């Protein structure tokens, strides 16, 4: 991984302050939902209304009256005023329309649960910008970008919906989210249990903080995915780093690397660490989107893309040049499966979305997730977790320093057994599962494991190629939601 422990993402078209420092594995959580065109529609467009609600910029202070418009989407085709429910998507780090169109599970179960679907956009993402074009100007404007403020937005929006939509006032609400949104769904149930009767937190790494889990668990799972997908695959990747180091020692070697990897720009010796970070991030992204069918989540990819990649990485005991030619073929599966890309751009994974800006600030304040590699239990170069280095980079970038223990102080870390009605789902292929809840905590804090699942596969729309493990997971999730809805109405009936 990176020599300075951080991957520099340059968004020079925005402004000088837009240079972002973010570790590849951590940025993957944010960039996972930020395609080049985040409002692109799926093959079958969803029918929803686009609405706006006036939110306070600061819910927890009393000397500011500034407000902004939070965007949210509503779909009520299958909603029933009698015995119905509200499924509330806790928006995360990106454009809410993209989330709406890519969370097919909610659309698939809406009729069965007689549900209204609500997708709430997270402040500072998409169109929900508290200070408009100045929202990312400096840390003073970004000061209100916190999970706590976002949860308060969700609470106020639910109150507004129940107050203004006839028939919604006395209906149960269930929070649903994936990845960071899954963390928010769980935290929302913890902090506002009177607002939602339960939460589905898919691929939510709520324990990827401080020392709650080993810092190397994420990259270890990435490595396991590659090791299981083809003979000698992870070993080939492990050996590629030294091959790159040796070949980049000379000008002719750099020139050869540029050609062999079909890069868009000539490599210099200063580019080598960035090149290795870019390659590392590619393997991370593949682990997260290792779906059982062809998909277009981050890039157009075949079914089980890691198996396809590993077909080119069967023999680690070859010359440096042949090994790296094989690495190119593997990279080409991710970046050029469509066959339309003429060269590979090692800055390509830095998307041009404001979502990346917001996430980099959150990673420098609250969402401080330790990652490390040792080159023994994983296929990456050794790299230790260095909080001071992160803190210094964050201060240089944003003028703020991280609070690594704040999330566990706010939400309890592993001491959450007093809460109820949260389903934590994780795919065993997903590297974020290492920071997730993978075992039942109580009868009502339940873990659902998807043996053939990558990153929140259960929230994707149903597919004929879905493995049995995800079909069972969705069935369990719906059963829990039905129980929460039934208990809500049973309790309401007893009170009258």
Swiss-Prot record:
BP GO terms, sorted: angiogenesis involved in wound healing; angiotensin maturation; energy homeostasis; glucose homeostasis; negative regulation of systemic arterial blood pressure; plasma kallikrein-kinin cascade; regulation of blood vessel endothelial cell migration; regulation of reactive oxygen species metabolic process
Primary localization: other
Keyword annotations from UniProtKB, A to Z: Carboxypeptidase, Disulfide bond, Glycoprotein, Hydrolase, Lysosome, Protease, Signal, Zymogen
Claim: Glycoprotein is one of the keywords in the record: yes
Signal peptide: 1-21
Positions of glycan attachment: 47, 101, 317, 336, 345, 415
Pro-peptide region(s): 22-45
Positions of the UniProt region annotated as SKS domain: 194-334
InterPro entries from the UniProt entry: AB_hydrolase_fold (IPR029058), Peptidase_S28 (IPR008758), Ser_carbopepase_S28_SKS (IPR042269)
Tissue: Highest levels in placenta, lung and liver. Also present in heart, brain, pancreas and kidney.
EC number(s) given by UniProt: 3.4.16.2
Entry GO terms, CC: azurophil granule membrane; basal part of cell; extracellular exosome; ficolin-1-rich granule membrane; intracellular membrane-bounded organelle; plasma membrane
Catalytic residue list: 179 (charge relay system), 430 (charge relay system), 455 (charge relay system)
Catalytic activity as recorded in UniProt: Cleavage of a -Pro-|-Xaa bond to release a C-terminal amino acid
Annotated Pfam families: Peptidase_S28
PANTHER family: LYSOSOMAL PRO-X CARBOXYPEPTIDASE, PROTEASE S28 PRO-X CARBOXYPEPTIDASE-RELATED
Protein family according to the UniProt entry: Belongs to the peptidase S28 family.
Subunit and interaction comment: Homodimer.
Primary role: Cleaves C-terminal amino acids linked to proline in peptides such as angiotensin II, III and des-Arg9-bradykinin. This cleavage occurs at acidic pH, but enzymatic activity is retained with some substrates at neutral pH.
Protein name: Lysosomal Pro-X carboxypeptidase
Gene for this chain: PRCP
């Amino acid at each position: 991984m990176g020599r300075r422990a951080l991957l520099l993402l340059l968004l020079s078209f925005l402004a000088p302050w837009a240079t972002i420092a973010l570790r590849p594995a951590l940025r993957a959580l944010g960039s996972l939902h930020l395609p080049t065109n985040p409002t692109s529609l799926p093959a079958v467009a969803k029918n929803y209304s686009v609405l706006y609600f006036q939110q306070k910029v600061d819910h927890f202070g009393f000397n500011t009256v500034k407000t902004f418009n939070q965007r949210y989407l509503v779909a009520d085709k299958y909603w029933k005023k009698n015995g119905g429910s509200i499924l509330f998507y806790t928006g995360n780090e990106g454009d809410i329309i993209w989330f709406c169109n890519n969370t097919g599970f909610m659309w698939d179960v809406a009729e069965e649960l007689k549900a209204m679907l609500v997708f709430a956009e997270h402040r500072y993402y998409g169109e929900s910008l508290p200070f408009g074009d100045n929202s990312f100007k400096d840390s003073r404007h970004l000061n209100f970008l916190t999970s706590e403020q976002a949860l308060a937005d969700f609470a106020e929006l639910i109150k507004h919906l129940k107050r203004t939509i006839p028939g919604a006032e006395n209906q149960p609400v269930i929070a649903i989210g994936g990845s960071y949104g899954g963390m928010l769904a769980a935290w929302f149930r913890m902090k506002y249990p009177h607002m939602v009767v339960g939460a589905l937190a898919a691929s939510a790494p709520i324990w990827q903080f401080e020392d709650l889990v080993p810092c190397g668990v994420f990259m270890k799972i990435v490595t396991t995915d590659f090791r299981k997908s083809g003979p000698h695959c992870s070993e080939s990747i492990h050996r590629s780093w030294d091959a790159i180091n040796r070949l980049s020692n000379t000008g002719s070697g750099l020139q050869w690397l540029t050609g062999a990897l079909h890069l868009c720009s000539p490599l210099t010796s200063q580019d080598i660490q960035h090149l290795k970070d870019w390659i590392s991030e590619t393997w991370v992204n593949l682990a997260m989107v290792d779906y059982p069918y062809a998909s277009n989540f981050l890039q157009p990819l075949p079914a089980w893309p890691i198996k396809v990649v590993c077909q080119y990485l069967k023999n680690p005991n070859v010359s440096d040049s042949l090994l790296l030619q094989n690495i190119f073929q593997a990279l080409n599966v991710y970046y050029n499966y469509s066959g339309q890309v003429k060269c590979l751009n090692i800055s390509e994974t830095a998307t041009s979305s404001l979502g990346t800006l917001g996430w980099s600030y959150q990673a420098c304040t609250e969402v401080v997730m330790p990652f490390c590699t040792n080159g023994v239990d994983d296929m990456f170069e050794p790299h230790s977790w260095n909080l001071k280095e992160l803190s210094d980079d964050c201060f240089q970038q944003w003028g703020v320093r991280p609070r690594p223990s704040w999330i566990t102080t706010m939400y309890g870390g592993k001491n959450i057994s007093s809460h109820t009605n949260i389903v934590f789902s994780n795919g065993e292929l997903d590297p974020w599962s290492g920071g997730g809840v993978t075992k039942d905590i109580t009868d009502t804090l339940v873990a659902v494991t998807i043996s053939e699942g990558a990153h929140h596969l259960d929230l994707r729309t149903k597919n004929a190629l879905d493995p049995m493990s995800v079909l069972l997971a969705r069935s369990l999730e719906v059963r829990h939601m039905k129980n929460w809805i039934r208990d809500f109405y049973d309790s309401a009936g007893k009170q009258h």
